[in-house]
């Protein structure tokens, strides 16, 4: 697992350095890991923003299952944009400090619904003290 996290850290940071200006002000290390398991038929998780304590970037890797990860324009979730998170794909969400973003715009509203047959995902984040 440490190798996986290190490869993501290194790869994302290097890719960011190829962009002018780089979206990453400094190198980073993932230090917060969460496994999310949704049972078959689960309601998922309602529209939310990741906590302010997370910075730079949030990585979500869906390992198994079928569901809908979506971004929303508002907490009511009426306008949803599907994010392809089928197993094997990695989703990147911005967090404060990514590309100089601050405040709420840095933390996109998102949620999970339409869980069919369960869902297993891994989240990697950079938590500030």
Named regions from a protein language model:
Residues 1-40:
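Signature of the catalytic double-stranded beta-helix
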Residues 23, 49-50, 58-59, 80-82, ...:
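A generic local secondary-structure boundary/capping motif
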Residues 28, 53-54, 76, 105:
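Short solvent-exposed loop/turn micro-motifs enriched in small/polar/acidic residues
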Residues 30-32, 58, 66, 119:
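Extracellular structured ligand-interaction cores
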Residues 37-40, 51-68:
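Short, conserved beta-strand element in jelly-roll/cupin
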Residues 43-47, 106-109:
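A short, acidic/glycine-rich surface segment
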């Amino acid at each position: 697992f440490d190798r996986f996290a290190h490869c993501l850290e290194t790869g994302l940071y290097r890719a960011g350095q190829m962009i002018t200006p780089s979206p990453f002000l400094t190198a980073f290390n993932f230090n917060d890991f969460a496994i999310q398991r949704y049972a078959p038929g689960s309601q998922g998780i309602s529209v939310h923003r990741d906590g302010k304590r997370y910075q730079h970037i949030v990585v979500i890797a869906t390992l198994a299952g079928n569901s809908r990860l979506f971004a929303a324009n508002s907490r009511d979730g009426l306008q949803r944009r599907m994010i392809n998170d089928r197993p094997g794909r990695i989703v990147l969400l911005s967090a404060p400090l990514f590309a100089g973003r601050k405040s709420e715009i840095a933390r996109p509203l998102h949620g999970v619904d339409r869980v069919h047959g369960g869902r297993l995902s891994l989240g990697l984040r950079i938590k500030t003290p």
